[in-house]
């Protein structure tokens, strides 16, 4: 019986220790002139994730969102949010850990970042902005494929030079 309890404790563990805003910025470089024009924006979303090991089985993951809205040729607003979290993760293979840090944790952080962006845009008196959900699993799979292709290309180049 005690052996079964130990096996359960040794299984995969995932705990959110903290979710917080690491950095936030909102700029309206062409105000107040931007408010005098018809509103027909082109909105661009750039996102990035990074992770760092803080201690054994404890990681910080930072999701960075940059939203740029242009109205014609002028930038209406630029919103930058770094939403971070501290996660305790153990009992995973290296591949599972990489997926957790690169896809699952950003999925946890994205709703907080999306809310922060929406709030900043509203405080700037711009029309409501609702960011569409992001498929971090697909983005992570694409990243893994790119890394594999780069590794294969590097291996082929090394063989050609040998």
Curated annotation (Swiss-Prot):
InterPro entries: SecB, SecB-like_sf. SUPFAM superfamilies: SecB-like (SSF54611). It is found in: Cytoplasm. Gene3D superfamilies: SecB-like (3.10.420.10). GO terms for biological process: protein folding; protein tetramerization; protein transport. Keywords: Chaperone, Cytoplasm, Protein transport, Translocation, Transport. The keyword Chaperone applies. GO terms for cellular component: cytoplasm. Its main location: cytoplasm. GO terms for molecular function: unfolded protein binding. PANTHER family: PROTEIN-EXPORT PROTEIN SECB, PTHR36918. One of the proteins required for the normal export of preproteins out of the cell cytoplasm. It is a molecular chaperone that binds to a subset of precursor proteins, maintaining them in a translocation-competent state. It also specifically binds to its receptor SecA. Belongs to the SecB family. This is Protein-export protein SecB.
